[in-house]
């Protein structure tokens, strides 16, 4: 009888640990120094299972005027999530030009697309950007975190 109780307690503890561990495995939270990057959509081209959005905006941190192209591909059967690739070009008032490759994942709920991106710049900087695209308002609003 004592062994049965002991086994049930051990099983309960293991189940509790599994529940706690699995909950933390599905959370994604980024913290630390970041800067805002806000853009206005300039075009949206739709295709079969894909879309391309271009946008532009002024970004601090020395980037200046930034032009973005995001190529979205649907990967879920319901059409509500997928991957994207893209390019960025920046030019500041001193005429310094930078470029970056963009890649990440997206999901959509209603008019809002949530994006998680890792961006590699030509100067070696890697940024993580996370934010939201409002398809109705035509805005893109990101928080950018320098990875390295």
Predicted regions and their residues:
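Beta-strand-enriched cores of mature, soluble protein domains
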Residues: 24-148
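Bacterial N-terminal signal peptides that target proteins for export
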Residues: 2-13
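Bacterial N-terminal signal peptides
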Residues: 11-21
